[in-house]
Swiss-Prot record:
UniProt cross-references to HAMAP family, sorted A to Z: ArgB
Function: Catalyzes the ATP-dependent phosphorylation of N-acetyl-L-glutamate.
The entry's keywords: Amino-acid biosynthesis, Arginine biosynthesis, ATP-binding, Cytoplasm, Kinase, Nucleotide-binding, Transferase
Pfam families: AA_kinase
Name listed for the protein in its UniProt record: Acetylglutamate kinase
Entry keyword annotation includes Cytoplasm: yes
Organism: Rhodopseudomonas palustris (strain TIE-1)
Pathway the protein contributes to: Amino-acid biosynthesis; L-arginine biosynthesis; N(2)-acetyl-L-ornithine from L-glutamate: step 2/4
Site feature location: Transition state stabilizer: 34, 256
Molecular function terms, GO-annotated: acetylglutamate kinase activity; ATP binding
């Protein structure tokens, strides 16, 4: 293990000076940050992320955090002996599973992240989409083609939802008042049923409703890769759709990019897919010239 390079006071001052125009660009702007379960990693990684979020708030940025929790949910289900199945990239969520999902997302993960942000000097408020009827959802549906019959079949995903409406009443009471919303991706139906919502989709819906300056999707890959597995630093919506059509963007990256496109069409200025395991990834993206990850824009 090597020691971190020593930076002279002059270099430290230069770094801060070079960050100034970027800080001014995001002054009083809302940034929605989706923090994936895989990106959370170890406790020190999560605490470093929390410190960066507090730094954003201290520089007059309005951060809104949406967290995932797939690995943590899987771990809890395994401990309880509940089998977990996936279809079309989404967790099939039956009555027993939705209770565990809500406990892990709105309980342990949400409150742990709130604690880390508060420990770093921020004022975080932990919520989920059910609070204040913030995010209303309808039952999600997916189809798959049976490999034998070639017949398209509708998959019952259980209590998995798609955001239908975002009510900003509660969020608007927090944003801009030195409070940092930390949101678990749960929503409710018109009848009061709790739905598990994909965290990327949830973050895209919230960012779109807020007309956020940026949506950052922190994940466990560097961003969108080309056919040679090299990072694509920037894409337009048109370029992204072409890459989906020709298969360059495939698998789990497709719904992420589709979330980016949706958010942009709702008024978000730019969306970035980036590796949340990179130290200070959020600060690198927002406050440096080179940024990090893949920026998708109109």
């Amino acid at each position: 293990m090597t020691d971190a390079p020593v930076i002279s006071p002059l270099d430290q001052a230069r770094i801060l000076s070079e960050a100034l125009p970027h800080m001014q660009r995001y002054d009083e702007e809302t940034i929605v940050i989706k923090y994936g379960g895989h990106a959370m990693g170890a406790e020190d990684t999560a605490k470093a992320f929390a410190r960066d979020i507090v730094l954003l708030e201290q520089t007059a940025v309005n951060p809104v955090v949406v967290h995932g929790g797939g690995p943590q949910i899987a771990q809890m289900l395994k401990r309880l002996g509940i089998k977990s199945e996936f279809a079309a990239g989404l967790r099939i969520t039956d009555a027993a599973t939705i209770e565990i999902v809500e406990m892990v997302l709105a309980g342990s993960i949400n409150k742990q992240l709130v604690g880390y942000i508060n420990e770093a000097g921020g004022k975080a408020v932990g919520l989920c989409g059910k609070d204040g009827n913030m995010v209303s959802a309808t039952k999600a549906t997916r189809t798959m083609v049976d490999p034998d019959s070639r017949i398209e079949e509708v998959i019952d995903l259980g209590f998995v939802g798609e955001p239908e409406k975002v009510d900003l009443t509660l969020l608007n009471q927090l944003i801009g008042h030195e409070l940092i919303p930390v949101l678990a991706p749960l929503a409710t139906s018109a009848s009061g049923q709790t739905f598990n919502v994909n965290a990327d989709t949830f973050a895209g819906a919230v960012a779109g409703a807020l007309r956020a300056k940026r949506l950052l999707l922190l994940t466990d890959v560097p961003g969108v890769l080309d056919q040679n597995k090299k990072l694509i630093p920037e894409l337009s919506i048109k370029d992204a759709r072409k890459l989906i059509a020709d298969g360059t963007i495939s698998g789990g990256m497709i719904p992420k990019v589709e979330t980016c496109i949706y958010a942009l069409e709702q008024g978000v200025e730019g969306v970035v897919i980036l590796d949340g395991k990179v130290p200070h990834a959020v600060l690198l993206e927002l406050f440096t010239n080179q940024g990090t990850g893949t920026l998708i824009h109109k």
